[in-house]
Regions:
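Polyanion-engaging groove/track-forming segments
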Residues: 1-612, 625, 629-638, 646-649, ...
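RecB-family 4Fe-4S metal-dependent nuclease core
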Residues: 349, 532-866
Length: 866
């Protein structure tokens, strides 16, 4: 690159195969454009040597071209651009050709003209132009090309422009306008055709036609890049290049791939897993172990799916994917890829009379041709050879622009490109996308060949393109003027990315006297295709009543009380229906998983008899860190991802800060006597109002004089942003009534008097329930409760006791818990809280209006499930 700094002034971020392929493609495109005029990069460097058009850069480009041509010829190949130039200058017509007729070609390349001029010395060459000779003799050159100077100023006579020029605000509205013009016809395909000057209109146009049961056919065919096989190969390419788990998940979600995995598992075990179970297990692996690569997934899947009673297809699927990638890395790449595609599509049944199957066959032929080329001699000339990722990248590059041709149905309407409209003979022509830059096509800001350089070199430029398109538009109009035909033009106001668009200059190419009226017509607002309707829900959700054997009627966890107090309906969704949102794309632990990680470290520490007696903060810190690393690698594998590594450092920091406090508690006489203590052992469950209450106390400590302390560890912030002070444990459990909020609006059992004498309501019962449950474990002993905050800043790290949790306050907590239990048994799950204090996992279901989005009819007591 240092030798060609005028072309590559800055080194690429990553100078790899992808960068080289794109750069080579850009330079080949420039050579192709120049070759239309019969020019090489060396020719351009010579022509622009004394110009102000970056001659230094053209010299560097010529140097690159020279090195490439030499390397090509040294390997026994010929430069195909030079071959084309020689053929144009010296070639002879094929045997048997005695006459050449060029009919209606408005824009032949200069190289083609040079070839025909050379042939004209050997045989007759005729040029046919569709135009009246009397008035347009001087509007074309000898080769039928429109003369730019003439067409730049020649008016285009659009019949009744006030009724034949239409506008649509967006591509979809342009499509609707086009389809409305077809409404009078019983068989639109027999009398009308649609022109598409802007490819952005194609998809909405096909959709609008399909909605009216009108088939669409594009004679230019479809790019291979739009087909499902290309999508599959693109994912395989990503897998080969990165082995990322994101690509693995996308790959398995391809229907044919998922079917292949299920089929293979059936062959191995005799039982075919369901598609739902396969995808559920894939999500489970993603959220449980956060694998970053296929190798991570291969290591972690056996741990996640270790239960012999619950088999999973995921480990077998991952092993198959790994074997596919290894086979692609073998010497016979083409055979391996063909066998892979054969296995993936083996379950499909192809029929010769099915148009979609015929397309598949054509695509298979194209894939085979490209694979043959990749196994050819040129592929072996790459330095260091081509690995599977490089071969797949080349395959995609070669296939992406290949064309396949679906079968045209009898009543389909044609969707012609702008330049193909010259050959369309439908009486009624509807042309969409009539915007500047599309018709006429414009060259704006080309990296190597801006419009000024094209003019200087005699290449196609904006003026010649305008002349070509003005002539084409005139031809479309005049060929229908006298035979009852019609041409409608539709332009847009905005593109698919909401960028503003201008009407085509061709639509302004009228007499000066008509220009004001034409301009005013363009400024009219586009007619509404449909009256806008206010947004409303399409339907209301109808939640079903819970069955009597649902677990929430028989046992509750202490944390579930908080969920019910927060919102009864969301409690019903989360715990009654067991609904939860899963983000299988996340790459780091969520708040709950991070908290569980720290809880696990502290539990393991508390169960080590040697660790619990430590009083040296450094030794405690070292013990915490060692346990943390063991747990992390046990869950997420030997290689931690970057996001998890960052979270690991956060965990180490928090535990390191707590180690100092932990040492202080030992020195103060608090000794750990239990960790992760269940308040309801299976052989002796704790019940309240006849309901079994489950829960786990994070830690139990004892002091010789102060009694027993129940600790719950929290990883959230202990700082109250509004009050600008540290939250007390009471603040987490009680919520003061808001200004204007009447106590009567809440059940009496939920109300309580806080420590400052104000009326509040219970928001959480976790520590009070722990206290009540553990009284039977430590009868007659003094019991206190506390929060330990393991937050992300050192000042927030600490232990906060709830010294006032006793007497009337504890009695109120018991009454509240009994009230919640009674309400759940009465199926009081309605109405919902309209707004939660933080984070709503079900907000997307309600569109911000839970009372409107849900029909609670079946939730009322006495309703029975359907």
């Amino acid at each position: 690159l240092n030798a060609h700094r005028n072309v590559f002034p800055v080194d690429p971020v990553e100078r790899g195969f992808t960068w080289a392929l794109k750069s080579a493609g850009d330079l080949l495109e420039v050579r192709e454009t120049l070759n239309e005029k019969g020019l090489s990069l060396a020719d351009v460097a010579r022509l622009l040597e004394h110009s102000e058009m970056e001659p230094e850069r053209w010299r560097d480009l010529a140097s690159i071209e020279r090195h490439c041509v030499i390397a090509t010829e040294e390997r026994g190949f010929s430069d195909w651009q030079a071959t084309r130039r020689r053929a144009a200058a010296f070639g002879k017509p094929p045997a048997g050709i005695t006459r050449v007729v060029m009919a209606g070609v408005l824009d032949p390349s200069s190289l083609a003209v040079e070839a025909l001029q050379h042939w004209s010395r050997l045989l007759p060459v005729e040029v046919l132009v569709y135009a009246p000779e009397a008035t347009h003799r001087d509007a074309f050159d000898l080769w039928g090309r429109p003369v730019a100077e003439t067409w730049l100023t020649r008016p285009i006579d659009i019949p009744t422009p006030e009724t034949t020029i239409h506008q649509g605000g967006t591509p979809a509205e342009q499509a609707e306008a086009a389809v409305e013009l077809l409404a009078p016809y019983d068989d639109p395909g027999a009398v009308a055709a649609i022109g598409v000057a802007d490819v952005e209109i194609t998809a909405p146009l096909e959709k609008a036609l399909a909605a009216r049961e009108i088939g669409a056919f594009d004679p230019a065919g479809r790019r291979m890049g739009t087909h499902g096989v290309f999508h599959l190969l693109r994912i395989v390419s990503q897998l080969a290049a990165t082995r990322s788990f994101r690509a693995v998940a996308e790959f398995i979600r391809c229907p044919d791939v998922a079917e292949t995995i299920r089929r293979r598992v059936e062959a191995q075990t005799g039982e075919k897993p369901s598609l739902r179970q396969l995808l559920d297990d894939l999500d489970t692996l993603a959220v449980t172990s956060l694998p970053d690569t296929l190798d991570d997934a291969l290591e972690l899947a056996p741990r996640v799916f270790s239960d012999p009673k619950k088999t999973s297809a995921v480990p077998a699927g991952l092993a198959w994917i790994d074997s596919v990638l290894k086979s692609l890395a073998a010497p016979d790449f083409g055979t391996a890829l063909t066998e892979f595609l054969g296995e993936v599509f083996a379950a499909r049944r192809f029929r010769s009379d099915n148009p979609q199957d015929a397309v598949f066959a054509a695509i298979a032929d194209q894939v085979s041709e490209v694979l043959d080329a990749l196994d050819g001699p040129a592929a072996h000339l790459f330095p260091g050879g081509l690995d599977p990722a490089h071969r797949l990248e080349l395959l995609l590059l070669a296939l992406g622009d290949q064309i396949f041709y679906p079968e045209r149905q009898a009543r389909d309407i044609d969707l012609q490109g702008w330049l193909e409209l010259l050959w369309e003979d439908a009486p009624h022509l509807i042309i969409t996308g009539m915007n500047d830059g599309k018709a006429p096509e414009a060259i704006i800001g080309h990296t190597f060949l801006p419009d000024s350089a094209r003019r200087a070199l005699g290449l196609r430029n904006n003026d010649t393109r305008f002349a070509r398109d003005a002539c084409l538009m005139t031809t479309l109009i005049e060929s229908r003027r006298h035979n009852g035909g019609r041409v409608d033009f539709i332009f847009g106001r905005t593109g698919s990315a909401e960028e503003p668009l201008r009407p085509s200059r061709l639509l302004f190419q009228c007499a000066d006297a008509d220009l004001p009226a034409r301009t005013l017509h363009f400024f009219n607002k586009p007619p509404r295709r449909a009256d806008p309707m206010p947004w409303q829900l399409a339907w209301r959700l109808r939640p079903q009543p819970l069955l009597d054997d649902n677990s929430v009627f028989h046992k509750l966890r202490v944390t579930q009380f908080r969920d019910y107090l927060q919102c009864p309906f969301r409690f019903y969704l989360r715990h009654g229906l067991r609904m939860s949102e899963i983000d299988a794309t996340r790459t780091e632990m969520d708040a709950m998983e991070f908290g569980s990680l720290l809880h696990g470290v502290l539990e393991t520490f508390a169960q080590d008899p040697d660790a619990v007696v430590l009083t040296d903060p450094e030794k405690i810190r070292a013990a915490f860190h060692a346990i943390l690393d063991r747990r992390l690698h046990g869950i997420y594998g030997a290689r931690l991802t970057v996001p998890v590594t960052i979270q690991r450092e956060s965990a180490r920091q928090r535990l390191g800060w707590w180690a100092e406090k932990e040492a202080e508690q030992r020195l103060q006489g608090w000794h750990i006597i239990a960790a992760e203590t269940r308040i309801s052992p299976e052989d002796d469950p704790w019940t309240l109002a006849g309901m079994t209450i489950n829960g786990t106390v994070d830690r139990v400590e004892r002091h010789a004089q102060l009694g027993v302390r129940l600790i719950d560890f929290k990883t959230r912030s202990a700082f109250d942003v509004q009050k600008k002070m540290r939250k007390t444990v009471e603040n987490y459990h009680l919520t003061p009534l808001k200004r204007g909020e009447e106590p009567e609006s809440h059940p009496a059992w939920s109300l309580v008097t806080s420590s400052d004498g104000t009326t509040a309501r219970w928001a959480d019962l976790q520590l009070p329930l722990y206290r009540l449950a553990m009284e039977r474990r430590f009868p007659g002993e003094k019991i206190t409760t506390a929060h330990v905050t393991l937050s992300k800043t050192k000042p927030e790290i600490g232990l906060d006791e709830w010294s006032g949790l006793d007497g009337p306050l504890l009695d109120s907590a018991r009454a509240c818990a009994e009230g919640v239990i009674a309400s759940i048994r009465d199926r009081a799950f309605w109405p919902p809280a309209e707004k939660l204090p933080y984070g709503d996992d079900f907000g997307a279901l309600f569109f911000g209006e839970p009372l409107e989005a849900v029909d609670p009819g079946l939730l009322v007591p006495g309703a029975s499930p359907e």
